[in-house]
């Protein structure tokens, strides 16, 4: 039994994972009296899989969540023990901030934050039913018979709906290792005639740190100049560490191949589809048989933790085989397994039954966020939680809904992909999914989204003040640069490599040349030297991308204009250079008749559509 002061809320959030935390926080910031229902209060902020936040595409989502005043970015920075900027050698648009997190510190940061959220009541219990009257949601009931009411309900059930854990041929019920699954709620959703499917994900065995031969391994240190997730973070909060790097080898692969029949997936126990971009070690050995090794990152789970997460060897093989293949790997010859790897199957709802507010079209007031919508990853879940939580609050308050467009955010790309295309496998965010990715950079997430959050009164005074100060610094920087006008001859005399065309250029236009830095321009205008490093970096990025963004917008418009273009029945997809094997196989199988049909294929990206369009035009020119 549980006891609460109030039985009526504006919003009820079911589930306390990354989506649930973000949804509850967002609803409260929007002024809604909110109940967060979770099986165990102590599990708020638990990282069920790998102890890391961010990555390619994912890091953009975290920065956008933070720009909207969300929780994840600050928690990631409070617990970050190894910062890495992925794709560092590439342009800012496709760089991905990532941090290794201390599990305990992350959980503590989340719980500390949630304890101080006004209008929030956290309830321990298991929801058995969503109460619906005349197709409209009005609350939830619990397995003990009690109920609470609300105009909006957000379901963020993760992998708990009819969750089944597989370790070899052994199966057990569970929402994750050591946690019960949700059966009654899953049955209720099925009874509502929602389009329910099954997906799977997996996790590797956890290893004892003291049993690893660290001296035999390569090491990957943290970046010297970390890229933080929150725009409020000014310094590293935790001691930084290195991760170990090792590799599988032919002997490892032999052990796995010889025992494929004992794998839950290859032994026939699992029919559902797993994440393509996070395959199990069995999948890697089978699908990439030509590879003699696969990289493994040995990620400490915390500064004081004795557990190591071997990223790259998730599995559903039995424990004895896991031990054998782990011991075949350099540095892990005597490693102890603290928790076996496993696969988990769970129910999800086809997200095409949702609108772009993540609300069920046929059940006003019922919102879904996270893995229940067919996604994978903490970041994707948190982003959906933000969208669902805000819109659940606005629904309860009879306010206008908030939608995110593809043009302004990765959050918009994520939601649009889910509700228009659906999923056939767990969905993961990549920069290639965004046609406007040159302008949707991690560095400018606040410039794109914080004004929206400010208009909705979702921000703290600290965040509003920080953003205002940043924009004032940028404005002053642009004023200084635009007031400076020089000829190409003057620029060359100052050592700048620009076109010798006699054209006069502003300082901002000079900065667009890749080889020109603000320090070069400062030779002509001393005031430029007074611009702080963070502002200088932002000005440089924006100057570099200005021309490319205009071209990107033209390409996106052209792609939209040509959606009706026919694709020949015998179109040679195999000869389209740059097309991923995944999409090539899907296109050959489905043979879409127009670009519009091709765009609706699960996993299709704007970049891939552009490649197909270019090939169509090339083929037409050759046959003319």
UniProtKB/Swiss-Prot annotation:
Organism encoding this protein: Jannaschia sp. (strain CCS1)
Biological process annotations from GO: tRNA methylation; tRNA wobble uridine modification
Places the protein is found: Cytoplasm
Superkingdom of source: Bacteria
GO cellular component: cytosol
Alphabetical keyword list: Cytoplasm, FAD, Flavoprotein, NAD, tRNA processing
Cofactor: FAD
Protein family: Belongs to the MnmG family.
InterPro entries associated with the record: FAD/NAD-bd_sf, GIDA_C_N, MnmG, MnmG-rel, MnmG-rel_CS, MnmG_C, MnmG_C_subdom, MnmG_C_subdom_sf
Function: NAD-binding protein involved in the addition of a carboxymethylaminomethyl (cmnm) group at the wobble position (U34) of certain tRNAs, forming tRNA-cmnm(5)s(2)U34.
Protein name: tRNA uridine 5-carboxymethylaminomethyl modification enzyme MnmG
UniProt keyword tRNA processing, yes or no: yes
SUPFAM superfamilies: FAD/NAD(P)-binding domain (SSF51905)
Record-linked Pfam families: GIDA, GIDA_C_1st, SAM_GIDA_C
NCBIfam families assigned: mnmG_gidA (TIGR00136)
Predominant localisation class: cytoplasm
GO MF annotations, alphabetized: flavin adenine dinucleotide binding
Binding site for FAD: 15-20
Summary of subunit composition and partner proteins: Homodimer. Heterotetramer of two MnmE and two MnmG subunits.
Keyword set includes Glycosyltransferase: no
Record: residues binding NAD(+): 274-288
